[in-house]
């Protein structure tokens, strides 16, 4: 186990009149995101407890638990600490990095759905609040291909293709809704606009897109959002790449002990993902556009 005690310096979410607009006004989308939160935590806990070696435990049991939870259409986001107590003890700082980025995702959906008249200003404010955190992921464009070339990279998608494609389906949903939400003028139109995406997402849950070779990217699925808010697009893509890295670390036998896994999670987080590393981060793409 891990004996080191980590201070839990959690921040409260950014307070605004638009808080919880998604939950109140577009509950069918909100409940899907609550299911996504469960899926990530349930995966990490099961990977850790099975040593990343037990294919049926992940591909069948843990994946089906997640699909069943999503099917209940949860009204509130789950307590991830209750779902993944072992993982939270192992790498709390990494989990808090996820939590703050997920709160940023939620805030941007709330703003998009709300009747807030100055949406750009609201997004600028919530982004500034996010960047003020010690757990902020860099808003610079990272070289995802280099970040996918560690010795243990691709271990998760190779061993667990179904759950990997399920995770990528979550990431599809998270970024595909931005352009339709922003283009639709009123709540009725927004509700209609996300329905085809929800239908595609639910189809992916039933038949995971195992043919995909890389995670979905914001600029591919919501190009107008990415052009308007490039820093947000980078943060969300980097968040999703960090998810892939941690899944690989938890799966790979190259890092046989929990201590080794924890050390590598924190090495990668501190060196390549946190905005606090921007001055020295070798994974930042300099200047040019970066496409997959």
Predicted regions, residues:
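Polar/charged low-complexity regulatory segments
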Residues: 2-292
């Amino acid at each position: 186990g891990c004996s080191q005690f980590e201070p839990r310096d959690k921040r409260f979410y950014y307070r605004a009149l638009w808080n919880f607009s998604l939950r109140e006004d577009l509950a069918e989308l909100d409940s899907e995101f609550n299911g996504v939160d469960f899926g990530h935590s349930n995966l990490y806990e099961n990977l850790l407890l099975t040593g990343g070696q037990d294919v049926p435990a992940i591909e069948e049991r843990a994946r089906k638990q997640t699909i069943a939870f999503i099917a209940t259409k949860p009204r509130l986001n789950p307590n991830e600490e209750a779902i993944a107590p072992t993982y939270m003890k192992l790498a709390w700082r990494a989990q808090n990095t996820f939590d703050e980025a997920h709160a940023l995702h939620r805030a941007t959906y709330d703003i998009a759905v709300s009747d807030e008249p100055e949406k750009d200003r609201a997004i600028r404010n919530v982004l500034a609040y996010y960047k003020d955190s010690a757990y902020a992921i860099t808003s610079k464009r990272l070289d995802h291909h280099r970040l996918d070339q560690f010795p243990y990279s691709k271990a998760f998608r190779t061993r667990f293709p179904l759950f990997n494609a399920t995770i990528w389906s979550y990431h599809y949903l998270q970024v595909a809704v931005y352009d339709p939400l922003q283009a639709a003028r009123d709540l009725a139109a927004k509700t209609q606009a996300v329905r085809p995406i929800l239908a595609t997402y639910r189809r992916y849950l039933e038949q995971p897109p195992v043919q995909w070779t890389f995670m979905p990217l914001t600029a591919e699925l919501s190009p107008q959002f990415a052009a308007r808010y490039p820093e947000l697009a980078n943060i969300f893509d980097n968040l999703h790449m960090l998810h892939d890295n941690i899944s690989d670390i938890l799966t790979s036998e190259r890092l046989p002990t929990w201590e080794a896994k924890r050390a590598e999670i924190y090495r990668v987080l501190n060196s390549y993902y946190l905005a606090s590393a921007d001055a020295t981060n070798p994974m930042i793409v300099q200047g040019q556009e970066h496409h997959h």
